[in-house]
Amino acid sequence: MLSFSGFEPWRTYLNGAFMQAPDILFVPTMGALHAGHGDLIRAARKWADGCGVRPTHVVVSIFINPTQFDEESDFSSYPTTPEEDAVLAADAGADAVVFPSVIEMYPQGVPSSVDPVHYGALTDTLEGAKRPGHFDGVVAVVRNLMEKVRPRWAFFGEKDWQQLAVIQRLIEFEFEGMEVVPVPTRREQSGLAMSSRNQRLSGSLRRDAAALYAALIRVAKSTDPQAESLQAAADLESLGFEVEYLEVVQEGSLEPEWVPGEMRVFVAARWGGVRLIDNVSCLQ
């Protein structure tokens, strides 16, 4: 696997290494890679290996995007592990990993604000309501990344389901011929969704954070998920979670109206000073 300090040297390499432009399979990340990211890269590798005779190239980017953090402390405390990230990416099957700089991504300087994005409930509810401007930053950086990489396929995890839906809408609107490939959530043995933020939880806190997933499953299996979500949120609060939302909405549009077979449970809560999010499909 090759490592590049930015997209310009990576693109120069591609132009010299391939007689025919390869189909690019892209896994954008913010680093602090874990087994869930490994699943994304392995999914891209498997997809590439099934593409037949066309040349392919699996590339991972690692860039901590300052415009999508609504709290400075969250940004400054985000873990950085570049050497370990490169090893994991290589082991999972990446052909290249790119570490773009803030200057490359924002040559005019990091903007104090970015253009607002309005995709209805996709951007205005749940994370969009609790973290105003968050998806503006996500869309800005993903648009920037896609313009630089121009992948045929981009791989994103279902743990950040709402972000996945927003990015799918962005690609549909602005990038013809590009496809988003969802990858299922990887979980720890306890059921806790894998996240780089989990590193900030001590042993017992990390173990007990699994109550979040248990609450989701309880709601999803209920005969009345929307009513059960209220009780589950109260029970999480009694355990010490600071619940921001626990809601049942349509997984495609994020609208609240009940549609059998199309509902999903979403939760965001603080635990041990760390903000955790997760989601599962309703099971009936």
Segments predicted by a language model, with ranges:
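A C-terminal functional module that forms or caps the active site or interfaces directly
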Residues: A232-Q284
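Nucleotidyltransferase catalytic core that binds NTPs
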Residues: M1-F241, V249, S253, V280
